[in-house]
């Protein structure tokens, strides 16, 4: 069983052309040593907790007497087993002759050919330099390549896959990956070199999981064993020592990290939302928490910085509110109330003051930050919870939504009566995540994935309905056949034979979305 819980595109121009292999020097060794100590302390805390639970269950530490307990062997029984397998005479065996047994294979060692250093072996036909060049070429990331990140869990093993997407070749493949300690919930790409104060550009990803820590990985390093940084390091160990009281604090989260958002104006700032109901602002130059906020009364599920004002943040929560806060001010944030848990929030990047809200009951709200007494419009977008909502950064009024009803829908929100352009089952199972690319040249490309564990990239410009709705923005020549790219031979995680059939809405049959 394999599922993908989150996907994210990396803008072109940030990835290294030739990613480096993981190298352990003295500095890295010392850093790993410190991280390992934290992991060891976590393991000790787990062991101590298990022993305490066992003692409580048994009553004052006494052993249980049910039939499941093991029976100790007597010394006579142990001796009998040694005799059966001749283990008592194991050290007394005579050495075998050189011409008999395993040693015989080395008896003709004098006849083996030996080549001096630098001398060519006639049986090795591949030039080492040629082999190195071939391997280097295979790892090369071209300027025309796009990187796509996918958080995958398969058979209780979680990792982040770094895909290379070649739009012109219609090719998608895994370039490298790295393991995670637990189930991933969200990904956020970072353009800041973590741990430095020189504001240098970087290529990193922050990962939120069921653990309270946030791991940050360098995407330009292959076969990395440990993350480049851990925000809130040691929080798990503290929580395990004080399980009964997960007290909220100003330094780290005490529960799962559900949402992350990087500030594209102040590049060293990252904000996180957690099941502990708090938001935390992190300084990536020091990897420390700058400030903690308690705007919500339930789990914080989604976040989005306002691109036109670096200090303004939009957040959504299971307390059925979306809130707008200026993090520089102490005053209470503005709030918009909805009828169900908030699953997604996103600013409309092409409108000055508007934003979207996606909820657990399938409704999408479009709001104006200047008037939160009512929404501009709202629509019943899906039959199930809206698990993902992506606003196209390059094409105005182009929005994608996905749901556990297994459908991805594309919307034209150019006026007060939004229209559904396409409704498509991409055969990814229950849709958990979708995201438009951030590059202008591939503006119509949408990645989606879900409960089947299959990652698909859909060139929506090849759909007739999309071309008609956004004809002024479709500049490239497109084929009549729709293009949906996926990783070949990837096993599906579940049977989709009972999926409903959905048809595109094309030509003159654009249908108005159901308005509430």
UniProtKB/Swiss-Prot annotation:
Modified residues annotated as Phosphoserine in this record: 21, 496-497
Extent of Basic and acidic residues compositional bias: 482-493
Swiss-Prot/TrEMBL WD repeat ranges: 182-227, 252-292, 295-335, 337-377, 381-421, 426-468
One of the protein's GO biological processes: rRNA processing
Protein name: Uncharacterized WD repeat-containing protein C17D11.16
Cellular compartment(s): Cytoplasm; Nucleus, Nucleolus
Source superkingdom: Eukaryota
Region of interest called Disordered, as start-end residue ranges on this chain: 46-74, 482-516
GO (cellular component) term, any one: nucleolus
Residue spans of biased composition, Polar residues class: 47-62
Biased composition (Acidic residues): 495-516
This protein's UniProt keywords: Cytoplasm, Nucleus, Phosphoprotein, Repeat, WD repeat
């Amino acid at each position: 069983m394999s599922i993908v819980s989150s996907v994210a595109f990396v803008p072109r121009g940030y990835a290294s052309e030739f990613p480096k292999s993981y190298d352990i020097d003295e500095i890295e060794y010392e850093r790993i040593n410190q991280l390992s100590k934290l992991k060891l302390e976590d393991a000790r805390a787990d062991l101590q907790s298990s022993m305490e639970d066992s003692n409580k269950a048994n009553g004052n530490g006494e052993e249980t007497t049910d039939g499941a307990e093991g029976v100790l062997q007597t010394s006579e029984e142990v001796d009998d087993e040694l005799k059966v397998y001749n283990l008592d005479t194991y050290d007394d065996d005579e050495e075998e002759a050189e011409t008999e047994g395993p040693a015989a294979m080395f008896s003709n060692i004098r006849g083996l050919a030996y080549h001096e250093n630098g001398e060519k072996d006639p049986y090795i036909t591949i030039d080492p330099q040629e082999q190195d060049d071939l391997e280097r070429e295979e790892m090369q990331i071209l300027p025309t390549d796009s990187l796509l990140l996918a958080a995958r869990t398969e058979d209780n093993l979680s990792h982040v896959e770094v895909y290379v997407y070649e739009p012109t070749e219609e090719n998608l493949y895994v370039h490298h990956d790295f393991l995670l300690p637990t189930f991933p919930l969200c990904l956020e790409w970072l353009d800041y070199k973590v741990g430095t104060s020189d504001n240098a550009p970087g290529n990193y990803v922050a990962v939120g999981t069921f653990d309270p820590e946030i791991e940050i990985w360098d995407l330009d390093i292959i076969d990395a064993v440990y993350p480049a940084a851990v925000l809130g390091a040691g929080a798990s160990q503290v929580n395990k020592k004080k399980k009964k009281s997960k007290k909220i604090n100003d330094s780290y989260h005490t529960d799962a990290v559900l949402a992350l958002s990087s500030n594209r104006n102040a590049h060293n700032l990252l904000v996180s939302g957690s099941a502990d109901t708090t938001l935390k602002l992190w300084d990536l130059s020091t990897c420390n928490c700058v400030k903690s906020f308690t705007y919500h009364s339930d789990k914080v599920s989604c976040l989005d910085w306002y691109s036109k004002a670096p200090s303004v943040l939009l957040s959504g929560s299971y307390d059925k509110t979306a809130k707008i806060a200026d993090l520089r001010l102490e005053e209470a944030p503005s709030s918009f109330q909805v009828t169900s848990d908030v699953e997604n929030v996103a600013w409309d990047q092409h409108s000055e003051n508007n934003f979207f809200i996606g909820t657990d009951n399938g409704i999408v709200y479009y709001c104006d930050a200047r008037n939160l007494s009512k929404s501009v419009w709202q629509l019943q977008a899906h039959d199930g919870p809206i698990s993902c909502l992506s606003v196209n950064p390059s094409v105005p009024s182009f929005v994608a939504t996905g749901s556990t009803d297994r459908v991805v829908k594309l919307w034209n929100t150019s006026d007060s009566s939004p229209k559904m352009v396409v409704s498509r089952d991409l055969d990814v199972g229950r849709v958990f995540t979708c995201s438009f690319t951030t590059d202008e040249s591939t503006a119509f490309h949408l990645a989606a994935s879900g409960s089947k564990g299959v990652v698909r990239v859909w060139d929506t410009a090849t759909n007739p309905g999309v071309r008609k709705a956004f004809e002024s923005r479709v500049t490239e020549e497109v084929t009549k056949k729709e293009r949906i790219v996926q990783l070949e031979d990837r096993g599906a995680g579940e049977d989709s034979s009972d999926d409903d059939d959905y048809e595109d809405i094309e030509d003159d049959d654009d249908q108005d979305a159901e308005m509430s």
